């Protein structure tokens, strides 16, 4: 017996103590979870765990019989784990009744620890057997389990969900509860369902790598090309070039096979073959386009192979004089009968189809062996056909090329389609027992075997058959002046060689002239015909199965409308019966046409396009460097995959250039359609990964780029609150930042309590999704703070990333400053001061009607920040034309404020962003609210012919001029002219106008007019002075009416108050704001937008109330006006 090491403090365990010394622990009903006694091993001869008052020991002898019976009554199963026996060092140390009492997990309210060698028994609330459980099965915290990582319901049942972070981390409920499902002590309903599904799914047919992949790939690669074209290729290209052609094709397919293997081993592969591999790697755009043409190509390939079979049968009938009608119609009849029989095999189930494939493979291999055996048997009767068995002279003669009307690449284009069957196994990935193992092993081995056979046939045919033969017996006399290899056998075939290039040989036999040479060489020629039948039928059968499987996966993803009906599966194997009949219909249509010479190259190019994208998928995923790209197949290389993709594209044009162009046009058209439709899927494709990678890389690169005037972009932090609560400011800022600069929608949630971060995260995702769905190129960010100023300071300091940081603060004008809490005015003005302190520019937007529409449905946040309930539909692009006037809605329900949102399931439906009570009645909008709602949408509409008036009174670096220039360049504003207003002296108006015109020309900014205002400092009208005085009256300190000490105290408590000294000191500046308002009304009352230099107030010298009064006086009763003040860093330059 060997003792285990002492228990460390980190184990949080202590040995049991006598019951009298133990504090009262929780009863089973009081503890939070009820967990049973569990261990992983039991039985005689096994290592079991002993316990007593000393540190635990491991014992090898079996437990006493009494304890065995008392603990569990023998070994029994409970849930997913066994309840087994436990042994003690002595029966006295662990009484039977102690083990029988059951165990209770320590409650969350109690503590249990030990430090050093001392044991703190006071906190130990566990019974003895607590320490004997298998680790991880005595808490709600789950141990690693594969079921937690399934994305959807697994074949073994429903998806299991691990305990959430909230369940483990959040505060306990007041009432403790018992959880019998914690870590699997009992079967959950999902697991019970899984167990039931396992018992019901035993009849499902799943193939291994040989029957599922190797056999199918070999049958598809060994097509009729092996029997009727390989020898002709040797005659044209010679042995050397033929081997090079086979090796080149094999290199392309091997690279593609490695790429396929890499994708297939980068996670669980479902049904769908090439479509599934490409779509889950490159995304739905490429996957959807390839999936459709790949399924169609397989369907038409069925017709190609069946017609090839029918032509061979008709030739045999013609030789025997047994034609039924004529050659063409006989092909149609035989082809129709054949495809019906193949459909019956496919519909019968994958198991029958697999058996048929095995039978056909046996015939095919027998035919190949029949050829090689026959090549060693020299028969005199075959010499007249050019077959002399193996001869060094024939090998030397046939080693080089002898192209007759062909070139190397034309011959290569004829052979390459024979090598395009490598996805036959991957296409039924859903029917494989272990796709991750089967696809790499079966595909690559099939490429190797078939490649060796093709090379063997090329060498064999070139070494024993001459290129031309007459088929006429020789008289075996010595032939003079004969240099051919057949001469020494007494045959002179020199007359067969064409004397003029392009002339057809007069002989009908030999490598050049006879497509049935392999029948001549073979030991038993009918076996070659059987091999041809086997090759064509097996390929047709594989394509007939592949097309519905791929199409079924495409239908289930719902990328194209109207095809979901074909995604339904039947039976235990989820067979796509509707897909089978659709494939049968397509194949039958092309069989009846019986002219496949035009469609054949297109089909080959469809397959090659799929291979190219599979290779590109691996390169793309490797380039993205995503942590999720971890294929277990290591024998791939991203650059080899890129080379494979390029080679596939090159081969497409070699085979047929117009077919390659047509294929690319079809793929591009389908790609554009799927991109436009934007299917609601998220597969974690490499496109997404590369987008992140590029964004990260470029963001880091930007950090090393110094600021320059020419690269300045307005990057705006827009204090919108909830994004659609102030749509007007969102739309206007979007007009000059879209595709130009950054827009960050800032939202400060005011709360003095602990924030609900779960709700905060949910809202962040929801609001960002709303921006995306409404084509607003902006980001949403939210912070929780005790007041608005603190939250805004957080954003001013931390918003953005690297160089993608805001440089301009955009806020709405505070229309209710005179009726609201004056402390909010203090906060508002301090926001402006804070922005300037952080070197931000500041932009303030004011509309007569106001900006905030969130109150229209009565949803005001209790925290003080108004959250959105109404959302304005901006589904059209902000630059698109929208000249139609807004509808005059009479209620919230009928207003365009209702938006289209999406739930987690991706289904769109109409609802407000924040749901309101369904039982609440529809409230008609009053006139003011209707005007507010209409005003909030005015920047969505086409502005028509109007003006954007720029009052550039103070040089702030050019931001006041840049913003209207960017706005006027947008499609909705393109008919608006820019008018510039500047201040100047009456006696030099022309000079100032010419100087400004020169500056604007150097800035390359178009303008329609420049107005120099020489009367800005004229005294304003008395009405304006009176209104201003009445405006500021409630906010005066009136220090003359009180003691100096009391006045100073009041000023310190209420710093927003206006002192008489301050008012007198800034009297001229206040009068200027009144006068400017008069001039604005005079010159710009009909403008579509006014952009004006914002007056500054010195911090600490001008009170908040006085500054607010200036801004109000300057901008009241006007069209939409932007008050702009840059940070006085140049943003415009006339240098190149």
Swiss-Prot record:
GO terms for biological process: ammonium transmembrane transport; cell volume homeostasis; chloride ion homeostasis; chloride transmembrane transport; ear development; inner ear morphogenesis; potassium ion homeostasis; potassium ion import across plasma membrane. It comes from the Eukaryota. InterPro entries: AA-permease/SLC12A_dom (IPR004841), AA_permease_N (IPR013612), NKCC1 (IPR002444), SLC12_C (IPR018491), SLC12A1/SLC12A2 (IPR002443), SLC12A_fam (IPR004842). The chain crosses the membrane at residues 209-234, 239-261, 286-314, 328-351, 352-376, 408-427, 439-462, 524-551, 577-595, 596-619, 637-656, 657-672. It is a multi-pass membrane protein. Chloride 2 binds at residues 294, 607, 611. Phosphorylated at Thr-125, Thr-129 and Thr-134 by OXSR1/OSR1 and STK39/SPAK downstream of WNK kinases (WNK1, WNK2, WNK3 or WNK4), promoting its activity. Glycans are attached at residues 475, 481. Residues 235-238, 315-327, 377-407, 463-523 are extracellular. It catalyses: K(+)(out) + 2 chloride(out) + Na(+)(out) = K(+)(in) + 2 chloride(in) + Na(+)(in). Residues 689-702 are annotated as: Scissor helix. K(+) binds at residues 220-221, 305, 417-418, 420. It is found in: Basolateral cell membrane. Changing residue 630 to A: Severely impairs transporter activity. Residues 1-73, 91-121, 875-921 are annotated as: Disordered. Keywords: Cell membrane, Chloride, Disulfide bond, Glycoprotein, Ion transport, Membrane, Metal-binding, Phosphoprotein, Potassium, Potassium transport, Sodium, Sodium transport, Symport, Transmembrane, Transmembrane helix, Transport. The modification Phosphothreonine is found at residues 125, 129, 134, 139, 152, 1059. Cation-chloride cotransporter which mediates the electroneutral transport of chloride, potassium and/or sodium ions across the membrane. Plays a vital role in the regulation of ionic balance and cell volume. Important for maintenance of endolymph volume in the otic vesicle, probably by regulating ion homeostasis. Also plays a role in normal development of the swim bladder. Activated following phosphorylation by OXSR1/OSR1 and STK39/SPAK. Inhibited by bumetanide. This is Solute carrier family 12 member 2. Changing residue 305 to F/H/W: Severely impairs transporter activity. The gene is slc12a2. It comes from Danio rerio. Changing residue 454 to A: Severely impairs transporter activity.
């Amino acid at each position: 017996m060997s003792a285990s090491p002492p228990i460390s403090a980190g184990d949080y365990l202590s040995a049991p103590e006598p019951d009298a010394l133990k504090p009262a622990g929780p009863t089973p009903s009081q503890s939070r979870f009820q967990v049973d006694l569990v261990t992983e091993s039991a039985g005689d001869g096994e290592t079991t765990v002993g316990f007593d008052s000393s540190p635990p020991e491991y014992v090898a002898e079996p437990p006493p019989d009494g304890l065995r019976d008392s603990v569990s009554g023998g070994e029994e199963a409970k849930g997913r784990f066994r309840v087994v026996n436990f042994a003690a060092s002595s029966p006295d140390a662990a009484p039977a009744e102690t083990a029988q009492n059951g165990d209770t997990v320590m409650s969350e309210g109690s503590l249990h620890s030990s430090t050093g060698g001392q044991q703190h028994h006071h906190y130990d609330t566990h019974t003895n057997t607590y320490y004997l459980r298998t680790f991880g099965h005595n808490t709600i915290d789950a141990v690693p389990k594969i079921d937690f990582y399934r994305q959807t319901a697994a074949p073994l049942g429903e998806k299991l969900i691990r305990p959430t972070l909230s369940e483990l981390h959040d505060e306990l409920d007041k009432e403790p509860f018992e959880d019998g499902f914690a870590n699997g002590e009992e079967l959950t309903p999902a697991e019970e369902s899984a167990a039931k599904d396992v018992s019901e799914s035993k009849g499902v047919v799943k193939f291994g790598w040989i029957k599922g992949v190797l056999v199918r790939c070999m049958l598809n690669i060994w097509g009729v090309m092996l029997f009727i074209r390989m020898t002709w290729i040797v005659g044209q290209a010679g042995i050397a070039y033929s081997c090079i052609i086979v090796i080149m094709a094999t290199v392309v397919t091997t690279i593609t096979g490695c790429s396929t293997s890499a994708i297939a081993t980068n996670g669980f592969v479902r049904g769908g073959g090439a479509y599934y591999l490409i779509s889950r790697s490159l995304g739905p755009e490429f996957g959807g386009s390839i999936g459709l043409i790949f399924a169609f190509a397989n369907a038409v390939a069925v017709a190609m192979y069946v017609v090839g079979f029918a032509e061979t049968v008709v030739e045999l009938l013609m030789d025997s004089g047994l034609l039924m009608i004529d050659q063409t119609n006989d092909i149609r009849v035989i082809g129709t009968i054949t495809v019906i029989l193949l459909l019956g095999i496919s519909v019968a189930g994958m198991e029958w189809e697999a058996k048929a494939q095995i039978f056909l493979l046996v015939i095919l291999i027998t035919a190949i062996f029949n050829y090689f055996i026959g090549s060693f048997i020299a028969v005199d009767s075959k010499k007249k056909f050019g077959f002399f068995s193996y001869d060094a002279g024939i090998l030397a003669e046939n080693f080089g090329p002898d192209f007759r009307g062909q070139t190397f690449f034309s011959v290569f284009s004829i052979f390459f389609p024979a090598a395009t069957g490598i996805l036959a196994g991957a296409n039924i990935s859903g029917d494989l027992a272990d796709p991750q193992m089967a696809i790499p092993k079966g595909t690559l081995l099939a490429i190797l075997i078939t490649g060796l056979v093709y090379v063997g046939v090329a060498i064999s045919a070139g070494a024993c058959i001459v290129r031309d033969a007459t088929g006429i017996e020789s008289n075996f006399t010595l032939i003079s002046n004969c240099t051919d290899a057949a001469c020494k056998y007494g045959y002179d075939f020199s007359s067969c060689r064409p004397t003029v290039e392009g002339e057809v040989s007069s002989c009908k036999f030999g490598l050049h002239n006879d497509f049935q040479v392999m029948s001549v060489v073979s030991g038993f020629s009918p076996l070659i015909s059987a091999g041809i039948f086997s090759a064509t039928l097996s390929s047709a059968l594989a394509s007939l199965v592949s097309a519905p499987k791929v199409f079924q996966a495409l239908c289930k993803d719902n990328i194209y409308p109207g095809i979901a009906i074909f995604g339904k599966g039947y039976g235990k194997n989820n067979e796509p019966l509707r897909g089978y009949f659709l494939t049968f219909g397509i194949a039958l249509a092309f069989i009846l046409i019986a002219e496949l010479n035009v469609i054949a190259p297109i089909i080959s190019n469809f397959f090659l396009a799929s291979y190219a994208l599979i290779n590109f998928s691996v390169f793309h995923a490797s380039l993205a460097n995503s942590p999720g790209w971890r294929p277990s197949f290591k024998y791939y290389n991203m650059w080899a995959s890129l080379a494979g993709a390029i080679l596939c594209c090159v081969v497409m044009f070699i085979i047929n250039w117009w077919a390659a162009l047509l294929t690319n046009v079809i793929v591009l058209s389908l790609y554009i359609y799927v991109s436009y439709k934007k299917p609601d899927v998220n597969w974690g494709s490499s496109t997404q990964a590369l987008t992140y990678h590029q964004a990260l890389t470029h963001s880091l690169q930007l950090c090393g780029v110094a600021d320059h005037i020419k690269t300045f972009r307005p990057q705006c932090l827009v204090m919108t609150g909830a994004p659609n609560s102030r749509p007007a400011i969102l739309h206007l800022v979007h007009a000059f930042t879209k595709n130009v600069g950054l827009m960050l929608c800032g939202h400060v949630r005011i709360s003095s309590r602990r924030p609900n971060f779960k709700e905060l995260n949910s809202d962040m995702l929801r609001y960002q999704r709303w921006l995306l769905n409404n084509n607003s190129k902006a980001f949403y960010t939210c912070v929780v703070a005790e007041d608005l100023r603190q939250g805004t300071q957080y954003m001013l300091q931390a918003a953005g990333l690297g160089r993608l940081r805001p440089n301009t603060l955009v806020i709405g004008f505070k229309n209710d400053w005179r009726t609201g809490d004056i402390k909010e005015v203090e906060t508002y003005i301090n926001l402006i001061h804070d922005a300037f302190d952080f070197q931000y520019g500041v932009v303030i937007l004011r509309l007569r009607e106001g900006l905030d529409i969130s109150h229209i449905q009565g949803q005001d946040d209790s925290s003080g920040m108004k959250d959105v309930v109404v959302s304005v539909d901006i589904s059209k692009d902000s630059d698109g034309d929208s000249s139609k006037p807004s509808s005059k809605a009479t209620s919230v329900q009928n207003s365009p404020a209702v938006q289209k949102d999406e739930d987690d399931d991706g289904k769109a439906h109409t609802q407000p962003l924040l749901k309101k009570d369904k039982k609440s009645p529809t409230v008609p909008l009053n006139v003011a609210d209707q005007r507010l709602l209409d005003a909030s949408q005015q920047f969505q509409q086409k502005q028509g012919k109007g003006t954007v008036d720029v009052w550039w009174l103070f040089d702030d670096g050019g931001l006041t001029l840049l913003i209207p220039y960017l706005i006027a360049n947008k499609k909705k504003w393109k008919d608006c002219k820019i008018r510039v207003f500047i201040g100047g002296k009456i006696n030099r108006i022309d000079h100032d106008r010419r100087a400004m015109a020169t500056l604007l020309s150097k800035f390359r900014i178009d303008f329609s007019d420049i107005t120099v205002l020489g009367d800005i400092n004229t005294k304003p009208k008395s009405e304006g002075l009176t209104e201003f005085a009445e405006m500021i009256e409630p906010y005066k300190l009136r220090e003359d009416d009180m003691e100096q000490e009391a006045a100073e105290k009041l000023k310190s408590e209420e710093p927003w108050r206006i002192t008489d000294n301050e008012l007198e000191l800034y009297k001229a500046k206040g009068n200027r704001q009144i006068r400017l308002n008069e001039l604005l009304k005079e010159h710009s009352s009909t403008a579509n937008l006014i952009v004006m230099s914002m007056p500054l107030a010195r911090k600490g010298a001008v009170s908040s109330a006085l500054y607010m009064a200036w801004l109000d006086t300057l901008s009241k009763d006007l069209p939409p006006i932007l008050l702009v003040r840059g940070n006085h860093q140049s943003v415009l330059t006339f240098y190149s």
